[in-house]
Amino acid sequence: MFSEPGKSKFQIDLRRHLRSQNICDNLIHLICEIAEASKYVINAVRTGDLGVAGTSNLYGEEQLALDVLSDRIMRKRLIHSGVVCNIASEEMDEIYQVTTDSNGLYSVAYDPLDGSSLVDVNLAVGTIVSIFSGCDLLQEGRKQVAAMYILYGPRVSLVYTVGDGVHEFTMNQLMEFNLTRENIRMQPDGNIYSPGGLRNKYNEGDEKFIRYLEAKGCKLRYSGGFVPDINQVLMKGKGLFMYPALNGSPNGKLRLLFELNPMAFIIEHAGGAATNGKIPILDIKPEGLDQRAPIYIGCVEDVNRAMEYVYKS
């Protein structure tokens, strides 16, 4: 390809890199349109209203004004891209049908602003995107043709995979995405962990797993934002994020379509693994837009060890 992993000798922009990936023009166009939309989202994050919108999403959660605005930005860009037939957003109650014609088109599921409640305290947030070929969004995550996230932190970075390596781009002063890391790979074992959920609600197996990680010398690194926490695990190449089943919440908190599938697709293609404690996240057949699942995601050996503890419990 263009460079060794983690190195970029020349300024390679997103579109040029996508053209090297042996994918069709429509998919290149779609990913670039999402990247363009993110430029408006980051502007909204930096300057937008931090109050509530007075509405709720399909999970009954109160929507922030930034959630609604970010969703509107992303949805409008997807509709006018000309290559999308169905859209599902964490902020919408049902699938938005752009066209009944699925020939050569894609369906997109996304979380427009994951971690939006962290904006008012100036912590990192992000956009998460899952792309399927055709009009069926309720497929196993393994059938995704692409997945990506955009992290809005001190720098704005975009990470994507189309099934052939995981690559990072960083927004420059001209708001262009240039390649900064190529073919990112996870190590087999890690030394950081990001545990979500209240620990006093953990099941016995998860509590024992946490004690195992602590005894191993793993460092706790948790921001409360799914995108920055996954980004840390991926970029360090060593670690684990977990949001397990909790007492009273057997399916955990995170959404399969909008959060888990795209992140699992990215991590697996970087040499990592993702499971709900029993089977790979990417093998779960979704039954609805609002489906949730526990997750253990990161280095293969840590994920396998988590499964052992969960299975024993």
Curated annotation (Swiss-Prot):
Annotated SUPFAM superfamilies: Carbohydrate phosphatase (SSF56655)
UniProt-listed PROSITE patterns: FBPASE
Pathway: Carbohydrate biosynthesis; gluconeogenesis
Keywords: Carbohydrate metabolism, Cytoplasm, Hydrolase, Magnesium, Metal-binding
Chief localisation class: cytoplasm
Required co-factors: Mg(2+)
Binding site for Mg(2+) 1: 90, 111, 113
Gene Ontology CC annotations of this record: cytosol
GO-annotated biological processes: fructose 1,6-bisphosphate metabolic process; fructose 6-phosphate metabolic process; fructose metabolic process; gluconeogenesis; sucrose biosynthetic process
Cofactor remark from the record: Binds 2 magnesium ions per subunit.
Annotated positions binding Mg(2+) 2: 111, 114, 259
Subcellular location: Cytoplasm
Catalytic activity: beta-D-fructose 1,6-bisphosphate + H2O = beta-D-fructose 6-phosphate + phosphate
Molecular function via GO: fructose 1,6-bisphosphate 1-phosphatase activity; magnesium ion binding
Record text on subunit structure and interactions: Homotetramer.
Name of the protein this chain belongs to: Fructose-1,6-bisphosphatase class 1
Lineage, top ranks: Bacteria, Pseudomonadati, Thermodesulfobacteriota, Desulfuromonadia, Geobacterales
